[in-house]
């Protein structure tokens, strides 16, 4: 049984707090797991979880699977510790202060499995972050509550809906992005999708993710006073 030993996971904070002397000028940002692979510039193969092919790039962002026909709107981060049964022990942490907007605790209700969405209203714009395939959700994490940077949200796992993720490939699916509309339910109803929307506006169809690694890289380089700086640098899709 996984225990939530601390409200904040200090080592995860320290790994990023010391990245730059200018950190105080930017919004706080921490990596969502104890993995130090990104912070220490290790090869992605050491910290990205492949999707079954053995190719670590399939755990990255973008058209990295099925010959580019399937878009992966986040990154998949490997665990760094497991129990004697092989289950991940890694805590999953809020990358920045925010509000819990959605918790899907029934894995079968989404391909994300058991997942949490945070909104970060103190940032410009108010981005969302998503934490998926969780094994457990921390008992003090509930919809509507505020969370702090580095607060433990749950435990990494391999929960899913409609397909199976083997325990050996357990990971955190992590997203950063923007919600397309706050009127998603009305759009969903007009489209007559044929099924119930259990996730309000935090349904994956309404979430527009950006590359989390690129976002973190820009932050580390001191080029993001606010997330808006990142979006200003994105190429226009035509």
Predicted regions: what they are:
Residues 14-23:
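Hydrophobic h-region of N-terminal signal peptides that target proteins for export
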Residues 95, 141, 146-147:
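Short, well-ordered loop/turn sites that connect or cap secondary structure elements
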Residues 23-114, 199-238:
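Surface-exposed, glycine-biased beta-strand/turn segments
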Residues 87-89, 95-138, 165-167, 171:
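Zn2+-dependent peptidoglycan hydrolase active-site motif and core
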Residues 59-66, 117-121, 141, 163:
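Intrinsically disordered, low-complexity boundary segments flanking structured domains
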Residues 79-83, 104, 135-138, 157-160:
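Short, well-ordered turn and helix-capping elements at secondary-structure junctions
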Residues 77, 110-118, 145-223:
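Conserved, short, structured surface segments that act as functional micro-motifs
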Residues 1-10:
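N-terminal export leaders
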């Amino acid at each position: 049984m996984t225990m939530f030993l601390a409200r904040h996971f200090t080592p995860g904070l320290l790994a990023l707090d010391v990245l730059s002397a200018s950190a105080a000028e930017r919004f706080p940002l921490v990596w969502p797991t104890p993995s130090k692979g990104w912070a220490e510039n290790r090869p992605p193969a050491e910290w990205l979880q492949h999707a079954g092919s053995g190719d670590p790039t399939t755990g990255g962002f973008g058209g990295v699977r099925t010959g580019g026909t399937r878009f992966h709107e986040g990154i998949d981060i490997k665990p760094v510790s497991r129990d004697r049964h092989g289950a991940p022990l890694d805590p999953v942490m809020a990358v920045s202060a925010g509000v819990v907007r959605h918790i899907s605790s029934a894995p079968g209700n989404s391909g994300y499995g058991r997942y949490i969405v945070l909104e970060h209203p103190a940032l410009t714009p108010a981005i969302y972050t998503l934490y998926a395939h969780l094994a457990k959700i921390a008992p003090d994490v509930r919809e509507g509550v505020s969370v702090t940077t580095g607060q433990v949200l749950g435990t990494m796992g391999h929960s899913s809906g409609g397909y199976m993720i083997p325990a050996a490939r357990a990971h955190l699916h992590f997203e950063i992005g923007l919600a397309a509309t706050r009127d998603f339910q009305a759009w969903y109803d007009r489209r007559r999708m044929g099924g119930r929307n259990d996730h309000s506006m935090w349904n994956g169809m309404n979430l527009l993710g950006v590359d989390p690694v690129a976002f973190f890289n820009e932050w580390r380089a001191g080029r993001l006073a606010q997330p808006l700086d990142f979006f200003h640098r994105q190429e226009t899709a035509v």
